[in-house]
């Protein structure tokens, strides 16, 4: 027969009693349940579940495809754009040479007509205009004639085939060129929604030094690196899940080789 368990004698020392915490009656506990049909869910980012418009879905798919697929060098070079500081300088200069608006043109023609009526020539009233040149065919003709001093190409032209040949043409003709980020930003210079390409042919005497510094910065980024960009393919970047899977496979393959 198993021996009976003996009871341990209680400690002769007094046990310290835990002090009771008094709760403030003003703060009432209201536990919530976030099950289906229960309390209102906390606010969280639900953008993943939004049904976005078709054009947004298309541009997102296009971006993913450009990352995933192997992109030929001629198209991949449009992913490398002019840096922010130089682009700010360029647009600051371009804004001085914006084409005249309809109101400005009317004002100029009225002033010229009054001058002619008073026996003067039109050139006495209006100075020689210095404007940014735009229009794809016009700019191509200026590049071929080597009249363009700086060419700006938008990186997001659709279809890209419209401008894909321009970097090669500029390099062949020795014309400085730069790929800038936004066709809409180029469009604002010429009072239009978008512009694929702009060219600077002439500037005033006071802006020649600024243009020269911009051209030297642009040449270092694009013309000097043209041969490198001509050989460099783009894309081929997989998503996070695929990269993790490939890393896992590589790790397993390395472990089997070690064995």
From Swiss-Prot:
Keywords: Cytoplasm, Phosphoprotein, Ribonucleoprotein, Ribosomal protein. InterPro entries: eL8/uL1-like, Ribosomal_eL30-like_sf, Ribosomal_eL8-like_CS, Ribosomal_eL8/eL30/eS12/Gad45, Ribosomal_eL8/Nhp2, Ribosomal_eL8_euk. It is found in: Cytoplasm. Pfam families: Ribosomal_L7Ae (PF01248). Its main location: cytoplasm. The modification Phosphoserine is found at residues 11, 33. GO terms for cellular component: cytosolic large ribosomal subunit; preribosome. One of its GO terms (biological process) is cytoplasmic translation. PANTHER family: RIBOSOMAL PROTEIN L7AE FAMILY MEMBER. Belongs to the eukaryotic ribosomal protein eL8 family. This is Large ribosomal subunit protein eL8. It comes from Schizosaccharomyces pombe (strain 972 / ATCC 24843) (Fission yeast).
């Amino acid at each position: 027969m198993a021996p009976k368990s003996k009871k341990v004698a209680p400690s002769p020392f007094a046990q310290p009693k835990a002090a009771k915490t008094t709760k403030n009656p003003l703060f009432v506990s209201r536990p919530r349940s976030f099950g289906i049909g229960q309390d209102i869910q906390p606010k969280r980012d639900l953008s993943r579940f939004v049904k976005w418009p078709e054009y947004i879905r298309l541009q997102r798919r296009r971006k993913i495809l450009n990352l995933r697929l192997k992109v030929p060098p001629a198209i991949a070079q449009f992913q490398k754009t002019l840096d922010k500081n130089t682009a700010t300088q360029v647009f600051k200069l371009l804004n001085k040479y914006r084409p005249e608006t309809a109101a400005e043109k009317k004002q100029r023609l009225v002033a010229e007509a009054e001058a002619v009526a008073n026996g003067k020539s039109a050139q006495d009233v209006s100075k020689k205009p210095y404007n940014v040149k735009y229009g794809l065919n016009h700019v191509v003709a200026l590049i071929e004639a080597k009249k363009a001093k700086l060419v700006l190409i938008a990186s997001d032209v659709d279809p890209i085939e419209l401008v894909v040949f321009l970097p090669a043409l500029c390099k062949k003709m020795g014309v400085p060129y730069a790929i800038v980020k936004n066709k809409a930003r180029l469009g604002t210079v010429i009072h239009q929604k978008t512009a694929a390409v702009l060219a600077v042919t002439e500037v005033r005497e006071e802006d020649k030094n600024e243009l020269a510094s911009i051209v030297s910065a642009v040449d270092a980024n694009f013309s000097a690196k043209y041969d490198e960009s001509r050989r460099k393919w783009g894309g081929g970047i997989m998503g996070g899940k695929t990269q993790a899977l490939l890393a896992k496979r590589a790790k397993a393959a390395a472990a089997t080789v070690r064995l």
